[in-house]
Amino acid sequence: MPPLSESEFLALAGKELDRIEAAVEAAADAADADIEISRTGNVMELEFENGSKIIINSQAPMQELWVAARSGGFHFRRDGERWVDTRSGDELYAALSAYVSQQAEAALKLG
């Protein structure tokens, strides 16, 4: 699949960040977890009751979504309709479910 233009990628990444935000809100509500979500442009910050954070941002030059969590830094690249970790091959929402659950100290399922 050919690379997207920067504007195409930013539009796609923006829609994905919208989906992530909605998924985190729904999962937090379902688990009665307190997660503060803030977003500025292509950067989303999730802040948990224990003070820990997860940062998710789009990297247009690399055409990736980057996730910084307590457990490490992860890069996700689009593969068809999915975003997959460039090292482990994990799908974005499965991976985010694990990171968010760890930091919220509650079982949350995104996606």
Curated annotation (Swiss-Prot):
Keywords carried by this UniProt record: Iron, Metal-binding
Q: Which GO terms describe its cellular component?
A: cytosol
Pfam families in the cross-refs:
Frataxin_Cyay
Quick check: keyword Metal-binding in the entry? yes
Gene3D superfamilies xref list? Frataxin/CyaY (3.30.920.10)
The organism sits in which domain of life?
Bacteria
Q: Name one GO molecular function term.
A: ferric iron binding
Signal peptide range in chain numbering: none
**TM spans, by residue?**
none
PANTHER family xref list: FRATAXIN, FRATAXIN, MITOCHONDRIAL
Provide the protein name. Iron-sulfur cluster assembly protein CyaY
Q: Which organism is it from?
A: Cupriavidus pinatubonensis (strain JMP 134 / LMG 1197)
Q: Could you tell me the gene encoding this protein?
A: cyaY
